[in-house]
Swiss-Prot record:
Belongs to the Maf family. It is an enzyme of class 3 (hydrolase). Its main location: cytoplasm. One of its GO terms (cellular component) is cytoplasm. This is Nucleoside triphosphate pyrophosphatase. The active site is at D79. Transmembrane segments: none annotated. Its EC number is 3.6.1.9. Coiled coil: none annotated.
Amino acid sequence: MTRFVLGSASQGRLGVLRQAGIDPEVVVSDVDEDALLASLDPELPPEAVVAKLANAKALSVAAALPQELLADCVVLGCDSMLYLDGRLSGKPGTPEAARRQWEQMAGTTGHLLTGHALLRLRDGVITHTEGDTGSTAVHFGRPSEAELTRYVDSGEPIHVAGAFTLDGLGGWFIDGIDGDPSNVIGVSLPLVQRLISRTGLSISEFWTR
């Protein structure tokens, strides 16, 4: 049986997959995202940046898999960033940065980009390497000063791409989206289905119900 490995510590991604019938093995990559970003050509399109990060994560996870998974599995690596006003933003990391991010994006529209990299492994050998980037337009509302302070104080926006969530407290301040909602949470279900099919497998093979 082919196993599904999620190369991410994101509870959002894990939750999306579980709600969609997949209970993956979770193996977290050890990629230094900041160092990798600093090494990339600054002229790279934003879609290519998140794709390269996702691919690096998938390869890192594949190199660390135990033997029982190496025999037959797929590894999914993902990376999400917000593209707004010509600039990519990842996780803000601090309350101050999260507040600045919201002050910039309130009342505007950005694009949440999620790079996906899928590796198929058989007997420890990578037989397929597939990848694509999902893009969803996000229309941000305008939280009041008190609401923004409370949101930042909750800690939620500090460790998520773009300083917002669609499926948590941040959802109160999202006026709408154009595109795939699961991509905003961190893993695009229809995109993963297409990547899986390119390896000769069907997504339904991984369903647990």
